[in-house]
């Protein structure tokens, strides 16, 4: 199986360093139980683990499914393509943010606010793509490649 991180490394022809991908079963269990608790308390609208493709791919998938862009402030490639286990993207009603932060501290679960879901662009710091373009790539890349190959014959 090719991971997003391995593919990124291959495409850039340079190793992505300082990425620690370890499986910690206790952390997996704690964070998974925390997510279930958040759903039970109706504190989050959705949750998606980032272990397959990292944060960048997860955010793109969520944007496509919800037809809604996002703005995140982090710009680190390593951060966005790290496929470390036991991490989740959650969406919440902004009115519940303080309650979520308080509960995460109480349960000793690390929490990072990535940004906000809004607009029609996928913004990673100063870099952005239009949601329409990403949506087209996601849904049509294979058929476009096949059409392109057929046109060469």
Language-model features, listed with the residues they occupy:
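Short, acidic (Asp/Glu-rich) active-site segment that either coordinates a divalent metal cofactor
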Residues: 1-20
């Amino acid at each position: 199986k090719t991971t997003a991180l391995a593919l990124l490394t291959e495409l850039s022809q340079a190793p992505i360093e300082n990425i620690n991908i370890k499986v910690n079963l206790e952390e997996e269990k704690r964070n998974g139980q925390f997510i279930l608790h958040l759903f039970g308390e109706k504190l989050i609208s959705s949750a998606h683990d980032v272990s397959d493709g990292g944060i960048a791919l997860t955010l793109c998938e969520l944007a496509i499914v919800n037809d809604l862009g996002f703005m995140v402030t982090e710009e680190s490639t390593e951060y966005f393509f790290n496929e470390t286990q036991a991490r989740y993207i959650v969406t919440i009603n902004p009115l519940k943010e303080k309650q979520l932060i308080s509960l995460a501290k109480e349960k000793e679960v690390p929490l990072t606010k990535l940004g906000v879901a809004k607009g029609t662009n996928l913004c990673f710091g100063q870099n952005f793509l239009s949601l329409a373009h990403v949506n087209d790539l996601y849904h049509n890349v294979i058929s476009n490649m096949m059409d392109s190959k057929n046109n060469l014959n």
